Amino acid sequence: MRVTFYTLGCKVNQNETGALAQLFEENGYTVVSNEEGADVYIVNSCTVTNFGDQKSRKWLRRAKRENPGAVTVLTGCYPQAFPDEAAEIAEADVVTGSGNRHAILTDVQKVLNGEEERVVDIRPHEKGERFEELPMDKFAEHTRAFVKVEDGCNRRCAYCVIPRARGPVRSRDEASVLEELRRLAAAGYKEVVLTAISLPSYGIDSGTSLVELIEKAAEVPGIERIRLGSLDPDMLHDDDIRRMAAVKKLCPQFHLSLQSGCDKTLRAMRRPYTTAQYADIAAKLCAAFGADNVSFTTDVIVGFPGETEDDFEASMAFVTGMRFLKVHVFPYSRREGTAAYDFADQLPEHEKEARSRRMTAAVEEVRAAEAAAMQGRKASVLLETPLSATMFTGYTKQYLPVLVSAPGHKTGDIVEVTLGAWDGKRCRAEIV
């Protein structure tokens, strides 16, 4: 039996798809690409935006049209957040949510065996439920491993459907995380990325903390770099920053979730910080890790209900002033079940798209300028994708993309380089 996956959304989704692929392989399936043709087609959905839901439905329709005898599966955040809507998608033979992922295998088998014509198996998340272990030892990227350490979110931001899609915070057992890190190190992975739905919430339900996990992860032999997923700035305290700065393996690249650079919009979004508080946290990280050594990335939503042109300009001024190395810009997507769905002053789609283009152009200028400012600096680069026998792409600790000629080296090596010119996509570099 052949199975193929189509994944939408965040690194957590990508991690879970990899774990599901491993689960199917361990039960006799062969994982193939989307183009090869399969007996089972699985879409792991994202529901952060309406567009994500549309892409899931479109992919299912195409899979069923081109492979009418195959079993099609819709799983993940979309059916969990909108179970009634997802259950009505005729092109999906199996519909499951974001929990109890191990059951997908059984659900698929029921349809394949003719025991059931169709299976809808969406189980609500419940308070007190435990983190679902989905072990994974192999990654599409052979140099960097993504390790899921937490699921769920206890916040209720006005725009966000994720708490509905993922349930409450559930932390993975620390021993389980460390055991996976040891397996990854033994397999040759040198960099790990700790991923989660609400990474700073790790441990609040189990009496530990993210900082403690980072400190213990750094003790695993063979792991040379630890990178963090998205962080909420208000959840980073002074002692956390001090302890993190003492972990030399921790990459000084921080994805600090912003969402807007306008205080009025942040209040409407129900984000628990101001732009001044955000900038203060960033300044403390710069002081702890070194201003020339640290980099910041973030997410920004434009076109939130009630955002005036002045609000947008204020947001853009703050965002560009923060000198982010990378900004993911999203036009606001109205999601049923969120507080903002019922807000007045919803902006037209064309205005949201126009603001998205303006913000993107502004932050790309900053990205180019920040990359250019690094020219001449020394940096360590993890070699990742070989373009030829000697030419590689890779990333610095600050997550700056680099192109370097490295004769005698191989994928997975960490090399010292001098950064050169920015070509619009990456920095050229030379081995020191």
What do the PLM-derived regions correspond to, one by one?
Residues 2, 67-68, 220-227:
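Short, surface-exposed connector motifs at secondary-structure boundaries
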Residues 256, 299, 319, 327, ...:
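Hydrophobic, well-ordered secondary-structure elements that form the walls
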Residues 186, 211-212, 219-220, 225, ...:
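Radical SAM/AdoMet-radical enzyme domain recognition
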Residues 342-432:
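Terminal RNA-binding accessory module
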Residues 206-218, 238-252, 307-324, 349-354, ...:
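Short, electropositive alpha-helical surface patch
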Residues 1-202, 239, 244, 250, ...:
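Proteins enriched for Cys/Gly/acidic motifs involved in redox and nucleic-acid/cofactor modification
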Residues 160-167, 225-234, 260-270, 291-311, ...:
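Conserved strand-turn element in the central/C-terminal portion of the radical SAM core barrel
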Residues 47-52, 189-216, 220, 232-239, ...:
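Conserved glycine-rich "GG(E/T)P / GGGxP" loop and the immediately following alpha-helix
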